[in-house]
Amino acid sequence: MERRKEILTWNDVDKLIDHLLPQFESTFDSMIMISRGGIIPGGLLAEAMDIQKLLIASVNFPSELEEMERPRLLAWPSFLMFPNEDLLNGDRILIVDDVWGSGRTITAVKNRVSAAGGFPFTCVLHFNPYRNLFGANRPNYFAATTDAFIIYPLEVDRDSTSSLLHNL
């Protein structure tokens, strides 16, 4: 069965950001944006919340996990990029990604922030509880719940012959 797809516009992304902002009851010392999906929402949130200390994390999981029906939790992530521990220690850190599907990537970043002495809080535009591998664990902040495969406006190829929209 083919998964349902949802194609978002930039206005949709703005509305999701507007839905997130009132959820934050306190401030954060810094933000980690997960590459690549968290960079755009992270930038928008950082600007709106005046977070100055912006950091990037890039995580990779073994490719064979993607092909499995239900990926194992025990696979070790490879951190291609991660902030130095002294940038995290003692800070309240907002970790931002576009979507929590399986939850593996953002959970790996959250655990590494905790291990470095930081206080992590997770934030995504979309939470998919149907793909979540972590039971009752969920993002601290999310704008929407979905079962769809989300296509964000930055992912839409503007060339009409090869775009995602053309193939739907």
Predicted regions and their residues:
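PRPP-associated nucleotide enzymes
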Residues: 1-168
